[in-house]
Amino acid sequence: MTLWTFLAMEPAYFITLATVLGLLVGSFLNVVVYRLPIMLERQWQREAHEVLGLPVTEHERFDLCLPASQCTQCGHRIRAWENLPVLSYLALRGRCSACKQRISVRYPLVEVGCALLSMVVAWRYGASVEALVLLPLTWSLLALSLIDHDQQLLPDAIVLPGLWLGLIVNYFGVWVPLPDAVCGAVVGYLSLWTVYWLFKLVTGKEGMGYGDFKLLALLGAWGGWQVLPLTLLLSSVLGALVGVYLLRVRNDSMGTAMPFGPYLAIAGWIAVLWGDEIYASNMQLLGF
């Protein structure tokens, strides 16, 4: 009996394995969410300086691997045992071992969130090809949501590989036939692109960024054109609810910019996982 056969026969072990893997990936996503925007900003500055003929400032190596993680308050280099997902945070009681300043609770929350999402995928699909390819999509959408929330940025470095991966996956018909995936990517991009320009023509303002177009194209590449209506509906409802909360509870102004990427990511993830069931339930309620 192979390991894969064993995991397929014993779903609990696969779910546990996916959950632990989600914790580890969540720890890495914390690094990606913090460092990738800085890396991109430095790259853009360097390219702008080169185009303008200005001196280029050379920085020390800064990527997803180096320098080693350190405390943002005192610069204490985080040791291996201090970097264990969730457990280290609990052992340190949420404080740096050197300066005793509080560590942001967001770090363990991201790790736990990634673990829970991975667990849901494993529970939904079991030990299958669908689960194996959907886990990277889930992690990518989580990273994109956090970066967009923090920086109002959806990096091509994550979006474009995710889009191509969706097309490759559906080349083998994992979710939908390849023509549906290609159509989903094209229609996903053009639908928000059209909304963007109509809004800009009417108001003279930009209602969303180009990253949102590409993110919806990514979701269309994975789930086909069939997931787009549900994704747009759910993301619009989520965005509207959060917008009302920000206006009524936090007293934000109408002009406060609000990233749309997280709502697209949440809605698209739901649509890819449960879109067929949601459509079937709605048709049944309508008597079709």
From Swiss-Prot:
Recite the UniProt cofactor note for this protein. Zinc is required for the N-terminal methylation of the mature pilin, but not for signal peptide cleavage.
InterPro entries of this UniProt entry? Answer: Peptidase_A24A_bac (IPR014032), Prepilin_IV_endopep_pep (IPR000045), Prepilin_pept_A24_N (IPR010627), Prepilin_peptidase/N-MTase (IPR050882)
A GO CC term assigned to this protein in UniProt = plasma membrane
Where is it predominantly found?
Answer: membrane
Report whether Transport shows up as a keyword of the record. Answer: no
UniProt keyword terms in alphabetical order: Cell inner membrane, Cell membrane, Hydrolase, Membrane, Metal-binding, Methyltransferase, Multifunctional enzyme, Protease, S-adenosyl-L-methionine, Transferase, Transmembrane, Transmembrane helix, Zinc
EC number(s) from the headed UniProt entry: 3.4.23.43, 2.1.1.-
Which Gene3D superfamilies did the record assign?
1.20.120.1220
Q: How does it sit in the membrane?
A: Multi-pass membrane protein
Write down the superkingdom of origin.
Bacteria
Q: Where in the cell is it found?
A: Cell inner membrane
Q: Which reaction does it catalyse?
A: Typically cleaves a -Gly-|-Phe- bond to release an N-terminal, basic peptide of 5-8 residues from type IV prepilin, and then N-methylates the new N-terminal amino group, the methyl donor being S-adenosyl-L-methionine
Q: Which GO MF terms are attached to this record?
A: aspartic-type endopeptidase activity; metal ion binding; methyltransferase activity
Which residues does the annotation say bind Zn(2+)? Answer: 71, 74, 96, 99
Residues crossing the lipid bilayer are: 14-34, 103-123, 127-147, 158-178, 182-202, 227-247, 254-274
Q: Name one GO biological process term.
A: signal peptide processing
Pfam families annotated for this entry? A24_N_bact, Peptidase_A24
Q: Which cofactor does it need?
A: Zn(2+)
Q: Hey, which family's this protein in? A: Belongs to the peptidase A24 family.
Instruction: Provide the function of this protein.
Output: Plays an essential role in type IV pili and type II pseudopili formation by proteolytically removing the leader sequence from substrate proteins and subsequently monomethylating the alpha-amino group of the newly exposed N-terminal phenylalanine.
Name of the protein in question: Prepilin leader peptidase/N-methyltransferase
